[in-house]
């Protein structure tokens, strides 16, 4: 019995020792666990700091521009690849637990592995080049010897000198090829442009070759403006700019540099802005509407009139449905020019032929089939003068106008103008299917000239008068807004031509045209004569300075069988006023059945009843009294 308490007394001591040992082991394990966790937290914090530093350095190149570099993003998987090695080491520590204590040197040694592979040091670079570019393998060292890159670089440097190396660097990322076609000097020249393994950071952008000197800049400016991507290049079209075309290139050719996403419109025919057109066929209308593509002459552009969106081309006005069928019709038209403007005389090859609209039938116009865009019809102005497009023209195949020199501020140019003699009308087909020759061919034929203004072409048919009573309301509705731009000098006077002008058009006083009165509002500063309404007031240089009217808008058939054209406003006593009064009188009636038809009281209809509906729907029902049927007939109403 005594051994039992001794044994029982020794048991608690053993348990206490076991408990003490257990607590000691637990404390050691807890201490080891705390050390491990502290190591993990320290390594995790350091890893996060390193990752943030690397991301901040890699993002520093994006902060300079508005868009990220796509080429650098494509190489980003190799940038972030070293960041996964510390996580693998941490996982290894977690799996091994207390057995393996990972030293901190191993955490950082993984970052040096890509560089130690190539035997290079990263301590000399303040930015840590490991995180800025992928490891430069041997394949990347041969990038600069790519023949395709050399071709694109040489073409880029020759065409776009002031673009610098930025455009060449955008074209740089091509698959690396081993090619030893370049010499060492060429590799050195293109090394800083095609350093693709190094990312396009601001440091690299500062090393780009500087623009060329100012002389080469000015020489290459025009070619660089007109240069387009190769997807938009049109073969066999080369623009050689002249000395005076640099001022207008920024406005005219600014829309050509559109890139590859928009269609190339250079194959369409627009008038050439050059004074000497490249195409020999452009001589006919390089001078007519070469100022802009909307057909406005140069004088309108100088006076401040720009082409409105609603303005149509001069040669394709669909509103013209009549042409001049008398080819010998002309009159003495003197246009007033503002001071300080050169007014060269017309070329002797000025010819009265026409740029009519393509909407007219070609059989009636005698259109040349191979020059469909400029059909030749009997009356047109094709001035051959190429020096200045703001031409003040005179057409004087007739006797001079009876007009005093001091015609209310209008300067009349009485100098003789050489004009070609017009062919007699009988052998000249007006409405035929035969195509007429080219304009430049007819200009070569018309080389003779007259030094007088008294040439009288024979014609048997007089032209009827055209009466005009136009005011602001009718003119503003008849023409567009930009054609009545009030920029003409007010000294031009109230009437440009006097009211009693006689045009001895056809050689005999008996067949001369009647007097034409042109009444206009003096605020408009626009006066029209008989000649301007006969087609001589178009935009082809005839009345460019005096008339701001729509080109080729007023045409009239002057064949002898055409009635008078009377354009009136609301204030004149005309047929339109009578019609408006009649319509107003009818509208006053209100179309009331009582007042309009004046039915008898017994014939006034009331609301239909069921009996009336049954009578109307019954086809077999006959009216009992024929007098009732007679009363409903239309002749009674």
Curated annotation (Swiss-Prot):
Domain of life: Eukaryota
Molecular function in Gene Ontology: cAMP response element binding protein binding
Region (Disordered) location: 105-184, 269-288, 299-462, 615-637
Biased composition (Polar residues): 145-159, 309-337, 377-395
Compositionally biased intervals (Low complexity): 344-365, 396-407, 430-447
Subcellular location: Nucleus; Cytoplasm
Biased composition (Pro residues): 418-429
Signal peptide: none
Pfam families: TORC_C (PF12886), TORC_M (PF12885), TORC_N (PF12884)
GO cellular component: cytoplasm; nucleus
Keywords: Activator, Cytoplasm, Nucleus, Phosphoprotein, Transcription, Transcription regulation
Modification Phosphothreonine, positions: 143, 151
Gene Ontology BP term (one): protein homotetramerization
TM ranges: none
Phosphoserine PTM positions: 66, 133, 145, 293, 377, 396, 561
Biased composition, class Basic residues, residue ranges: 105-115
Family: Belongs to the TORC family.
Function statement: Transcriptional coactivator for creb1 which activates transcription through both consensus and variant cAMP response element (CRE) sites. Acts as a coactivator, in the SIK/TORC signaling pathway, being active when dephosphorylated and acts independently of creb1 'Ser-119' phosphorylation. Enhances the interaction of creb1 with taf4. Regulates the expression of specific CREB-activated genes such as the steroidogenic gene, StAR. Potent coactivator of ppargc1a and inducer of mitochondrial biogenesis in muscle cells.
UniProt subunit comment: Binding, as a tetramer, through its N-terminal region, with the bZIP domain of creb1 enhances recruitment of taf4 to the promoter. 'Arg-300' in the bZIP domain of creb1 is essential for this interaction.
Name recorded for this polypeptide: CREB-regulated transcription coactivator 3
